[in-house]
């Protein structure tokens, strides 16, 4: 009846509501959320009630806090810089970084496929699929992609970091 921790398995700003309600009712245990809340609106809606919350997230969320030895840091920072140049400082979206990563993966695969077949042909589509499934060590903003015919996600442990919300900010937890 008095758990040590609560996992709110939600996404987006609505995931702040159960946590705010538990705080109002006096729950003082730990809070965990999912990567689905890794956006500035969650922080805005949750306010101080979401401080001290832990969540796993893509490394891009805390790119500037990653150790320089982290292989994703450079690409994640490049995404953040490009996104914020277009949309303003502090506007970065982890969700947009998934699209960025997809672009990097398809660019690498298309570069390989075009060497084997003419674009627009069935042969090219087959080569593109083969190249996608042969993707190795493509560094994105969320992780490093290594795909196969059986793994179309291609991400491993390097694709997530633990983050804590501290005073309304995302803080990397090594």
Model region roles, listed by residue range:
Residues 1-174:
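Extracytosolic ligand-binding ectodomains
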């Amino acid at each position: 009846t008095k758990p040590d921790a609560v996992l709110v398995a939600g996404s987006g700003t609505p995931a702040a509501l159960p946590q705010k309600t538990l705080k109002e009712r006096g729950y003082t245990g730990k809070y965990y959320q999912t990567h689905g809340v890794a956006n500035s609106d969650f922080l805005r809606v949750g306010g101080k009630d979401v401080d001290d919350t832990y969540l796993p997230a893509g490394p891009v969320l805390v790119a500037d806090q990653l150790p320089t030895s982290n292989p994703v840091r450079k690409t994640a920072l490049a995404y953040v810089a490009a996104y914020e140049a277009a949309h303003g400082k502090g506007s970065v979206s982890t969700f947009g970084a998934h699209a960025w990563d997809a672009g990097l993966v398809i660019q690498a695969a298309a570069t390989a496929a075009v060497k084997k077949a003419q674009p627009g042909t069935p042969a090219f589509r087959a080569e593109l699929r083969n190249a996608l499934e042969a993707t190795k060590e493509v560094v994105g903003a969320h992780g490093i992609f290594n795909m196969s015919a059986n793994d179309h996600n291609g991400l491993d442990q390097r694709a997530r970091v633990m983050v804590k919300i501290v005073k309304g900010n995302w803080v990397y937890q090594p």
